[in-house]
Amino acid sequence: MARRILVVEDEAPIREMVCFVLEQNGFQPVEAEDYDSAVNQLNEPWPDLILLDWMLPGGSGIQFIKHLKRESMTRDIPVVMLTARGEEEDRVRGLETGADDYITKPFSPKELVARIKAVMRRISPMAVEEVIKMQGLSLNPTSHRVMAGEEPLEMGPTEFKLLHFFMTHPERVYSREQLLNHVWGTNVYVEDRTVDVHIRRLRKALEPGGHDRMVQTVRGTGYRFSTRF
């Protein structure tokens, strides 16, 4: 599914150009021409990223970011400021308010797309990654599919995230606490033993292709994902 990007820009030529570039690069742009219409676009399906102009009819980009951060459902949506205000003080103010990056007009389409992808990699690594393959096991971050050879494997979303982390960090030992921080996040409280439950579920899901052996217990330390049995 294409990543949904909300383009908040009051100048129609710039907004249309940005939307065209996004479409050409596989994104799904959604347009907003002023502050109020941007707020009205904050509903399901939520945007994966927001391109936000500094100055808007009805309010400022800074005010819009503050609105995002007040709401639990929108506070984690990444924001790239798209504006003619290039002074250092303005850039710092935007970043300190909560913007994830800053691009100054005029800009090239290549730079715009590169910055969007860079922010998405930092915020949500699975959003832009290619298919990951190891020992006949493949994981597609975009379609959320896992295959053992040609056979699809069924697993829950937490097991998928756990497998994704393991496949991108193979041959390393991680404690339960480290896995909780990397997979569940630091703002979620769950017990260490929750990791054990999902490890068991992940192994069960990987059994059909014999890949359950890749999820290894390191006694007294934690878990490792390895091709060395």
Curated annotation (Swiss-Prot):
Look up the record and give one Gene Ontology term from the biological process aspect.
phosphate ion transport
Where in the sequence is 4-aspartylphosphate found?
A: 53
Q: Which GO terms describe its molecular function?
A: phosphorelay response regulator activity; transcription cis-regulatory region binding
Q: How is it modified after translation?
A: Phosphorylated by PhoR.
Database matches in InterPro entries: CheY-like_superfamily, OmpR/PhoB-type_DNA-bd, Sig_transdc_resp-reg_PhoB, Sig_transdc_resp-reg_receiver, WalR-like, WH-like_DNA-bd_sf
Q: Please list which residues make up the signal peptide.
A: none
Decide whether keyword Transport is in the record. Answer: yes
The record's GO CC annotations read: cytosol; protein-DNA complex
Q: Which UniProt keywords apply?
A: Activator, Cytoplasm, DNA-binding, Phosphate transport, Phosphoprotein, Transcription, Transcription regulation, Transport, Two-component regulatory system
Domain Response regulatory, by residue range, is: 4-120
User: What positions does the DNA-binding region cover?
Assistant: 129-227
- What's the main place this protein lives? cytoplasm
User: Where does the record place it?
Assistant: Cytoplasm
Known function: This protein is a positive regulator for the phosphate regulon. Transcription of this operon is positively regulated by PhoB and PhoR when phosphate is limited.
Tell me the protein's name. Phosphate regulon transcriptional regulatory protein PhoB
Q: Which organism is it from?
A: Shigella flexneri
Gene this chain is encoded by: phoB
